[in-house]
Regions:
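C-terminal-of-GTPase-core extension/linker across diverse P-loop GTPases
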Residues: 1-23, 31-44, 48, 52-58, ...
Length: 238
């Protein structure tokens, strides 16, 4: 099937903002047609393209809003830990229902509730309106995804977060978070050592993530938290 219109297409591009390799992927059709062999191939190619990318541009048609296909592609990028920019195209067209970017952004984030870290840019590919902003954001979110934070600064944030909101408990046993360190970048990945992984509920993990974002930014990139359980005896030996 190589050479079909469903292949991802690489385009090298250079401007005053830097050198880029754009990987233009074919769209994913509606579920009723996804059994078609070519469409299955396009889905596979989308996965492969996302894996190769440093930054993913999720292009949304302003006249349609977030479609099922958009949600699928967003999910692929999020699960792959890629930096993401949401690009709302055709913002210049009169049939765009709501020209209020604040309201429109709210609708987008409601549909993609796990991707509120991604910035939204409103553009017109036809007129070139605000297209240059895309390159500024590409560089910005790429750098955010590569950010490293010292262990000392991380644990200052962690201790403040624990003081502000007490860790959860169950049946008389309370979660103790000993310390946190950064393991890798793209996406920024942090390891938190605690006395009980079972007590480290998703809601408290989200709280810690929000504290990290409030302090350091990490705009445009998912954050991965790895929970490691250690006994209190192990911590005493450290």
């Amino acid at each position: 099937m190589a050479g079909t219109t469903r292949d991802a297409i690489d385009t090298r591009f250079e401007n005053e903002y830097g050198k880029y390799n754009f990987i233009d992927t074919a769209g994913i059709r509606r579920q009723s047609k996804v059994d078609d062999k070519i469409e299955k191939y396009s889905v596979l190619r989308a996965h492969m393209a996302v894996e190769r990318a440093d930054v993913c541009l999720l292009v949304i048609d302003a006249t349609e809003g977030v479609t099922d296909q958009d949600e699928k592609i967003a999910g692929i990028a999020h699960e792959a830990g890629k930096a993401v920019i949401i690009v709302v195209n055709k913002w210049d067209l009169p049939e765009t229902e709501d020209k209020d970017t604040v309201k429109y952004s709210k609708k987008v984030y409601e549909a993609l509730s796990y991707m509120t870290y991604a910035p939204i840019i409103y553009v017109s590919a036809l007129t070139g309106q605000r297209v240059v902003k895309i390159f500024e954001q590409i560089n910005y979110v790429f750098n955010q995804s590569k950010m490293r934070v010292s262990t000392g600064m991380l644990n200052d944030v962690l201790n403040e977060a624990i003081t502000r909101v007490q860790p959860p408990s169950d049946k008389g046993r309370r979660l103790k978070v000993y310390y946190m360190t950064q393991a890798s970048v793209a996406p920024p990945t942090f390891v938190l050592f605690c006395n009980s992984a079972a007590l480290f509920h998703f809601s408290y993990q989200r709280y810690i993530e929000n504290c990290l974002r409030d302090t350091f930014g990490f705009k445009g990139t998912p954050i991965k938290l790895i929970i490691r359980q250690r006994s209190e005896e192990d911590e005493t030996k450290l």
